[in-house]
């Protein structure tokens, strides 16, 4: 039987062999490029653009054009990469290594390059970005925050500008004109957050010139790709409008749950991050709210608020899951340790936390537009990414994004030592051991980076270090303004830096003078994260570019991960060994248990992301249809009669069919058809019951359609200017579409939140959602067409029509 591991290794070797061969071709141009003058090298950009234009000239079919473009870019790759490489040497003083060329080839191929920390991912990207920007279709370089977008655009932009390409930076709060200019550049630096919301907002505009993204989604190159494509994928992007005010039930539910006793009145499920009332708790609820049955069908709103209050109070922890700043509850991104500005929990959970923290409860918003990052990035013609850690999520990246993860060798051998985990029975004993090691290392002058699992833990460790008179910096979600400065200095002699997960990404930690001789940077972690990737990122801060260093993880049986998954087996083993609190355990069983727990969490998180995607895939088909129809209307330059009149005809057919269901024509509801004509199609006395009697169903439809056509011609004559007529048609159609689409999105949001309960009735929630979402969409289309018909046909024409 074939060994699957051997097959994977062989495939990996084949991939690297192929990459090496192409990288050799790139390097073969080195002397030629070096001999060119600046102007000769810069002229290559125009030469490449001409070759691309010639390759796709005269090809009308879009798919064939895209294939021709891909072919010519592949042919140009060795020479174009060599141009960008030589340009980097002259402009930036940096010359990409062989392994960086390999990484950039992976990026051009639409895959994910896994490159260790300090291997120069930003420089690696330049060659693939340059080549793909030559097409003039736009390249989006996606980063995790505005700071990195601005930094990389400024640094690498010098190279692109020198080579004759334009560079734009899309900052979140920039005005529309600046965003438009940024997106129209050859290369655009932006965060995933900004691109997602700009895409949604562009599909809510009423005029073509209001869009900021004037071109399609061509090529995205994502930095820290695992963070963006995986960690943020559980939270959909939602544009909201004002809702129906704040319910008083949030405060009442919060007061109630604060009277309850743990284990007696409720049970906390740490693994599922849920809290459930016991029978005693339910009884107390019935007394508190003066009800006979807390779970009566008439009181579902109350029970929903109680459920959210329970989660807010007992599953969401202050300074771990969120912070309170300036009277607001702000979420902490668990993968980065940073505050997720502008992100709110849905389904009333955020309001429940606000009630818990006694800050102003903000009203629930109505969803108007939404998309998941999975579906956003799958719309790009080509998607690639780079990160230090992705192999653990290889299956998900392949299945969701059709990307292969290819590990690029390091330029120099890795000398960092990753020591075995140390396990203690209690948090107190663990911190004692951590501080003891910090003191020992600090006496030598060796720099130390200590990674903690939460803001709360970083502040606790900081207090302990203060009592020991150990000078240190703290970096967490509360003080991330100095992030770059703190991290940049973390490799200096004697530096002690306490940080949350945010220390694992972004700015490199470079060793100060004399630090290499001391053994390099030491990374200490006070617990294992849910994800092995986050642990590996933290480890990767030490030993960059062949530097020395080591990493050490300290764990306790009281850590969140151990409590939620698998601590019991380890605890029993330690009890059998009869160990005291301060005794440390280190063996392969512990490491395997922890990694097993992490795999379970990663599996759960993958299931959550897949679930979010499955539900969004239902909406995706509807969203693409609506957005396409909006684009057709907005981009029309002559007349929308060909769009509007079929909508009118379908509305007529629906109304007539609904009122003529009976076999006998004498039983047809002709007065209702006459009422429809007066309400939505023509003037009140345009048709009578007598005129419809004796006609067949099809003849009635034809008569009503003829009335509609006459009405349309009348509107045309009143609006003698075709431009005004077109503007009128656009306003009518877009208003109807937008009103009903936003209502539909909000109703789907509520449907998704409620459909899970049907699982208790042995029904598949996803299938139920698909079925109802489709039925609701069909009804929405009918409502849009009816409102368009009524508004257009019954409108009194006035001049200066504007949306």
Swiss-Prot record:
It is an enzyme of class 7 (translocase). GO terms for molecular function: ATP binding; protein-exporting ATPase activity. PANTHER family: CHLOROPLAST PROTEIN-TRANSPORTING ATPASE, SECA INNER MEMBRANE COMPONENT OF SEC PROTEIN SECRETION SYSTEM. CDD domains: DEXDc_SecA, SF2_C_secA. The gene is secA. Monomer and homodimer. Part of the essential Sec protein translocation apparatus which comprises SecA, SecYEG and auxiliary proteins SecDF. Other proteins may also be involved. Part of the Sec protein translocase complex. Interacts with the SecYEG preprotein conducting channel. Has a central role in coupling the hydrolysis of ATP to the transfer of proteins into and across the cell membrane, serving as an ATP-driven molecular motor driving the stepwise translocation of polypeptide chains across the membrane. Its EC number is 7.4.2.8. It catalyses: ATP + H2O + cellular proteinSide 1 = ADP + phosphate + cellular proteinSide 2. Pfam families: P-loop_SecA, SecA_DEAD, SecA_PP_bind, SecA_SW. PROSITE patterns: SECA, SECA_MOTOR_DEAD. Keywords: ATP-binding, Cell membrane, Cytoplasm, Membrane, Nucleotide-binding, Protein transport, Translocase, Translocation, Transport. This is Protein translocase subunit SecA. It comes from Leuconostoc mesenteroides subsp. mesenteroides (strain ATCC 8293 / DSM 20343 / BCRC 11652 / CCM 1803 / JCM 6124 / NCDO 523 / NBRC 100496 / NCIMB 8023 / NCTC 12954 / NRRL B-1118 / 37Y). NCBIfam families: PRK09200.1 (NF006630), secA (TIGR00963).
């Amino acid at each position: 039987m074939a060994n699957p591991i051997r097959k994977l290794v062989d495939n990996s070797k084949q991939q690297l062999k192929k990459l090496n061969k192409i990288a050799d071709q790139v390097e073969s141009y080195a002397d030629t490029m070096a001999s060119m003058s600046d102007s000769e090298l810069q002229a290559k950009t125009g030469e490449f653009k001409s070759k691309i234009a010639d390759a796709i000239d005269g090809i009308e079919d879009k798919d064939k054009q895209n294939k021709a473009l891909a072919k010519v870019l592949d042919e140009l790759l060795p020479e174009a990469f060599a141009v960008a490489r030589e340009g980097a040497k002259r402009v930036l003083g940096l010359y990409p290594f062989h392994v960086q060329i390999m990484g950039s080839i992976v990026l051009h191929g639409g895959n994910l390059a896994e490159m260790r920390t300090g291997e120069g991912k930003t420089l690696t990207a330049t060659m693939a970005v340059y080549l793909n920007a030559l097409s003039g279709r736009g390249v989006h370089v996606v980063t995790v925050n505005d700071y990195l977008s601005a930094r990389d655009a400024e640094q690498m932009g010098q190279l692109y500008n020198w080579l004759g390409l334009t560079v734009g930076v899309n900052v979140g709060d920039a005005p529309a004109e600046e965003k438009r200019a940024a997106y129209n550049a050859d290369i655009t630096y932006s965060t995933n957050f900004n691109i997602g919301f700009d895409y949604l907002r562009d599909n809510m505009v009423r005029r073509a010139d209001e869009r900021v993204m004037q071109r399609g989604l061509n090529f995205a190159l994502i930095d820290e790709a695992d963070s963006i494509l995986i960690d943020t994928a559980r939270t959909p992007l939602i544009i909201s409008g004002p809702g129906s005010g704040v319910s008083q039930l949030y405060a009442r539910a919060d007061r109630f749950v604060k009277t309850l006793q743990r284990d007696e009145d409720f049970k906390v499920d740490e693994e599922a991050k849920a809290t459930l009332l016991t029978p005693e708790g339910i009884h107390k609820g019935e007394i508190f709210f003066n009800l006979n049955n807390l779970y009566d069908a008439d009181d579902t709103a109350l029970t929903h608020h109680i459920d959210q209050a329970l989660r807010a109070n007992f599953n969401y922890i202050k300074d771990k899951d969120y912070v309170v700043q300036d009277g607001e509850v702000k979420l902490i991104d668990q993968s980065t340790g940073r505050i997720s500005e502008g992100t709110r929990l849905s389904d009333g959970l955020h309001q429940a936390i606000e009630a818990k923290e006694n800050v102003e409860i903000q009203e629930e918003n109505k969803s108007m537009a939404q998309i998941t990052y999975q579906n956003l990035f799958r719309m790009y013609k080509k998607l690639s990414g780079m990160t230090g850690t992705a192999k653990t999520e290889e299956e998900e990246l392949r299945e969701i994004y059709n990307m292969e993860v290819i590990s690029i060798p390091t330029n120099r051998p890795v000398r960092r030592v990753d020591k075995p985990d140390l396990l203690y029975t209690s948090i107190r004993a663990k911190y004692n051991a951590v501080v003891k090691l910090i003191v020992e290392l600090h006496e030598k002058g060796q720099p130390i980076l200590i990674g903690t699992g939460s803001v709360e833990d970083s502040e606790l460790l900081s207090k302990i270090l203060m009592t020991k008179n150990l000078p240190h910096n703290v970096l967490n979600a509360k003080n991330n303004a100095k992030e770059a400065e703190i991290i940049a200095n973390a490799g200096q002699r004697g530096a002690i830096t306490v940080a949350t997960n945010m220390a694992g990404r972004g700015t490199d930690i470079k060793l100060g003078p004399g630090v290499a001789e001391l053994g390099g940077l030491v990374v200490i972690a006070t617990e294992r994260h849910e994800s092995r990737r986050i642990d590996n990122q933290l480890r990767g801060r030490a030993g960059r570019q062949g530097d020395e260093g080591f990493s050490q993880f300290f764990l306790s049986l009281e850590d969140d991960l151990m409590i939620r998954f698998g601590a019991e087996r380890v605890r029993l083993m330690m009890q059998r060994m009869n160990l005291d609190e301060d005794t440390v355990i280190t063996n392969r069983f512990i490491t395997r248990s922890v990694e097993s727990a992490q795999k379970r969490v990663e599996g759960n998180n993958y299931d959550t992301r897949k679930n979010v995607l499955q539900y969004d895939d239902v909406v995706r088909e509807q969203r693409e249809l609506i957005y396409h129809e909006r684009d057709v209307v907005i981009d029309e330059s002559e007349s929308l009669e060909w769009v509007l009149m079929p909508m009118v005809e379908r509305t007529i057919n629906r109304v007539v069919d609904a009122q003529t269901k009976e076999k006998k024509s004498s039983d047809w509801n002709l007065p209702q058809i006459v009422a429809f004509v007066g309400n939505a199609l023509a003037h009140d006395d345009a048709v009578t019951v007598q005129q419809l009697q004796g006609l067949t169903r099809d003849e009635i439809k034809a008569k009503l359609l003829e009335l509609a056509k006459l009405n349309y011609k009348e509107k045309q004559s009143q609006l003698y200017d075709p431009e005004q007529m077109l503007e009128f048609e656009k306003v009518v159609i877009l208003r109807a579409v937008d009103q009903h689409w936003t209502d539909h999105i909000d109703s789907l949001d509520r449907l998704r939140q409620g459909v899970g309960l049907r699982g208790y009735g042995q029904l598949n929630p996803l299938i139920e959602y698909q079925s109802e979402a489709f039925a609701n969409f069909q009804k929405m289309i009918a409502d849009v067409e009816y409102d368009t018909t009524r508004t257009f046909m019954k409108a009194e024409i006035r001049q200066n029509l504007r949306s």
